[in-house]
A protein has these predicted regions:
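Hydrophobic scaffolds flanking metal-cofactor catalytic centers in soluble metalloenzymes
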Residues: 1-205
Length: 206
């Protein structure tokens, strides 16, 4: 069977293309999972809390130069030092599931242009994150380094933003609990089914 690969990915540096392909596979697997109504509802709450926080942080300057002077890969771009992590770790199973069930689809995972070197997260570019806020992990939206905290404190916004961070953290915690409980059930279900079949065979003497 032929696998269709987006042209944009083929034009990416090999390391970024590989991370994008792995992330897309995981996202498709999560989208194919059977979930009850609670998990998508909790995921949407995470998305709403992310947007509420992100729209409250405007015109900050700390994020545009925080990586300057750092060793590679952090210092490859002037800003986004906190974005220099590994894509698969930033989009861990909980974060990716929250995105999937809030509406993120493979087509939403748009990388920066090829001219932006791959330096950390696959979506980190010279001008910032290539993803729309609703498609970013919660940890990316809620992270406040010392420089950013100092900036919003000087602007008198820190207390409000910390309250919004707490709301996002609570929403993500509730989703994480539901998601992990479902994953546990997925692991246990085949075991219980096998035990049930064994007991039935024993009862019938077959």
């Amino acid at each position: 069977m032929r696998t269709w690969v987006p042209l944009a990915r083929l034009l990416q540096p090999r390391s970024r293309a590989a991370e994008l392909a792995a992330l897309e596979r995981r996202l498709r697997d999560e989208l194919a999972a059977e979930v009850d109504a609670d998990e998508p509802a909790l995921a949407r709450a995470v998305g709403e809390a992310k947007l509420a926080l992100a729209t409250s942080i405007t015109d900050v300057v700390a994020c545009g130069s925080c990586a300057s002077g750092h060793p590679l890969p952090v210092g490859q771009h002037p800003g986004g030092a906190c974005c220099a992590g590994v894509t698969g770790e930033l989009f861990d199973d909980d974060e990716l599931a929250a995105l999937a069930h809030a509406g993120t689809r493979p087509a939403d995972l748009q990388p920066p242009a090829r001219r932006h070197p791959h330096a950390g997260c696959a979506f980190r570019g010279a001008t910032g994150c290539s993803l729309a806020t609703e498609h970013r992990p919660a940890r990316c939206v809620r992270y406040f380094c010392h420089g950013l905290r100092a900036e919003v404190h000087r602007r008198g916004q820190l207390d409000d933003l910390e309250a919004r961070v707490a709301t996002l953290d609570a929403a993500m915690s509730a989703f994480r609990t539901a998601h992990r409980a479902r994953r546990d059930r997925e692991v246990v279900a085949p075991i219980l089914a096998a035990i049930t079949r064994h007991l039935k065979r024993g009862a019938t003497g077959s």
